[in-house]
Amino acid sequence: MVKIRLKRMGSKFRPVYKIVVADARAPRDGKFIEALGHYNPSNKDFVLDSEKTAKWLANGAKPTVTVWNLFKNNKLTESLKAKK
């Protein structure tokens, strides 16, 4: 199963996350298929390639709960559902 999830990056106590498409069995910070964007929780910076995300959702990738909540908080769920 393919998931859209967060990959932790950054330094200790200052996380920055990449939003990636990865195999569900791969480690959290391991190999991924494609990067879709990034999220910085300290300054709430959120960047996402919505076309790539819509393509992966249409192909059956499942977002994790945390990623789906990020989509909802940034009001992207309706636009992503419409592009499906």
UniProtKB/Swiss-Prot annotation:
The keyword Ligase does not apply. Disulfide bonds: none annotated. GO terms for biological process: translation. Pfam families: Ribosomal_S16. One of its GO terms (molecular function) is structural constituent of ribosome. GO terms for cellular component: cytoplasm; small ribosomal subunit. Keywords: Ribonucleoprotein, Ribosomal protein. Belongs to the bacterial ribosomal protein bS16 family. This is Small ribosomal subunit protein bS16. It comes from Mycoplasmopsis synoviae (strain 53). The gene is rpsP.
